[in-house]
Amino acid sequence: MSANHSKTKKKSSIGFVEGVRRSRPLYLLMLPSIIIFALFTYYPMYGIVIAFKNFTPADGIMGSSWAGLKYFKQYFNSYQFGLTIKNTIIISLYTIAVTFPLPVIMGLLVNQMKAQKFKKFFQVSTYLPHFISTVVMAGMMILFLSPSTGIIAKLVGLLGFKLPNLMGSAKAFPHIYVWSEAWQHVGWDSILYIATLSSVDPTLYEAATMDGANKWHKMIHIDVPALLPTATIMFIMRMGSVMSVGFEKVYLLQNTLNSTSSEIISTYVYKMGLVSSQYSLSAAIGLFNNIINLILLLAVNFISSKMSDTSLI
């Protein structure tokens, strides 16, 4: 029995080595990405330990004294804990509610378009905003929504109304962030769903046409089931980053007037770590944030695996 086991193990190891040898060019192409990923993603994880230490640059990571859960308790007992958690969850769930279904809907609509020229124009025009940098996008929002010189303010003024200071409104901030995010990325995110629909067997549509199905029936009974596995995987991945709202755009659009709704975990970590030099506190907050994301990812993945055959793991 042991001889057979060792023989099988030897064969599997030989098979792995042989597979690597045959695919050597592919592994060499992967090597730079693996090295970069290891250096900038896995190696910095060593610094997580400062969340449990009274870290100072002078003492270094190893020389700093242990603090236990001191900085976690400091964050949990602070006023900013409830505020940052609430704002992060509101903006994140609002973003998912808008930007997750819209690419699916756009993919379904594009798949139904028959005029090829209009279809290409529509796709290109919706993809282009994705290539606008976050800094430029934030600048555009500030310029457009300026109550004195903004384009929207002037258009509203022609109708006899006055545009309020939306960038200074805590209530308006989540809407500005989410809908600018949708305008910028929905078209690009729909590419995955359009590609999925392009792989659907054309004979299914032909059979449905022969059975008297219209476009709506084809969409519901052919297109939507074809998209469900892809959409499920994307939803699981989105739920795994619920607590990680994009820092750049929020920080660029943030000001003292809207900070009660724009102060999220990532901006607070930046202010504590790089502005106030409270490295241990910022590391503790970041670690807490990542643990919550991991728990959500595993929970949603578990539910998905029980309810369907689709899961990440």
In which residue ranges do the predicted regions lie?
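Short, Lys/Arg-rich, polar N-terminal cytosolic tail immediately upstream
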Residues: 1-19
